[in-house]
Amino acid sequence: MRIVPRLTVVLYFLVLVAACSSTPQTVPEYQGDYLDRAQSQEKDGIRVTAAVPSAAESKAIFGKPLYKRGVQPVWLKIENNRDEIVAFLPVGLDPVYFTPIEAANMSLKDKKKVSDKRSLINEQFFEAGMINNVPAGEQRSGFVFSRLDEGTKAFNVDLIGDSGFTPFTFFIPVPGLQLDHHTVDWKNLYPADQFLDLSSDELIEKIESETCCATDKGGKGTADPVNLVVIGTPDEVYYAFIRAGWDETETIYKGSSWKTIGSFISGGEYRYSPVSALYVFNRGQDIAFQKARANIHERNHLRLWMSPYRYEGEPVWLGQISRDIGVRFAKKTITTHKIDPDVDETREGLLENLAYSQALAKVAYLGGVGEAPIDQPRANLTGDPYFTDGFRLVLWVTSHPIDIADIQLEYWRVPPDRQSIP
């Protein structure tokens, strides 16, 4: 009796399901400015092009305010240059994606009782949906209706065939938000003669002599501890943190202010709310990320400042991370958060977050913050107490997935509670 390998069986059923669930039609390519922002990748005989329409573009295409319903269409074109059929797996793009007809009927007005049983069958959305199977030598294009992610949309496009599994990862900026880091000119952040290429010993000395904490604008008040060092290009930093589930943040303007106030009052989630400025190198943070939890009162905040230092050709950033456990109104920044006093727990949580997200290449520790025992805590600008072992976590981030088992350890310094770790 011939035993069929398990992978072959899985491939067979996936391709069969894709073939049965899709008709071999060619969906027209919808025109629009979003196609000018399309990105293409090619691997192992397959070329994938992806684009993400903005809220206005989505409404123009489909005639419905999809973003207001939490639906974000992602346009794909898959060109199969192999001699075998391949199947696109939409759950890789979004595990709980919407079907085309589901996306068409998500407003409350569409859910009223109807007498015409065909009224819920929206042929426009159905015809626009992505076809899952792509025969050899052919191409297919269409939309996948995913959950809404404003700012930079990060997603996978996974394909499977007899030759195996072929994954693609995209990070596509979507117009609509006024993001803080979009105004930063990275190339001219410092004069050219201020950039320093450092050896490991020189970097250790520089980092450990940097300020312990961020400050207020005047440089006088002591804010939260600068407990992170990140090494990587701006793009690697964006992609690593977005891959790990962090959201970009908006600047403070009228629109973001109203959204923040609304979230504060309702306790709702505003994933991209502005982050108040703290100062290192005499300027506010260059990038801020946040990870929302249940509501605006509970989230993690992360700030990064690019330093003038370079290590092995890569930019070195100083950073600060805190876990917010409450919120109150503030005169200058609309709201301000109360932080969890155990800032080391939050720091280590970031290490685990990046490692599990395959966004981390190497890790180390350095001093520089200064110890603050639990019985002698320090306070930040708003009077919130915190305690720490005084170490800075050094993270080499990557935009290319790295297995958690392949993360390297650099033993520059070892915190006391990790002395026994080999």
What are these regions (language model features)?
Residues V17-A19:
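C-terminal motif of bacterial Sec signal peptides marking the signal peptidase cleavage site
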Residues V27-E29, L35, V96, F126-Q194:
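Surface-exposed edge beta-strand/loop patches
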Residues P28-K68:
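Low-complexity, acidic Ser/Thr/Pro/Gly-rich terminal tails and inter-domain linkers that flank the onset
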Residues E79, K254-S420:
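A cross-kingdom signal targeting lumenal/periplasmic-facing segments of multi-pass membrane
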Residues N81-V134, R140:
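The feature marks short-to-medium sequence segments in extracytoplasmic or secretory-pathway proteins
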Residues E84-G92, F155-V157, Y238-I242:
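Short, hydrophobic/aromatic beta-strand segments
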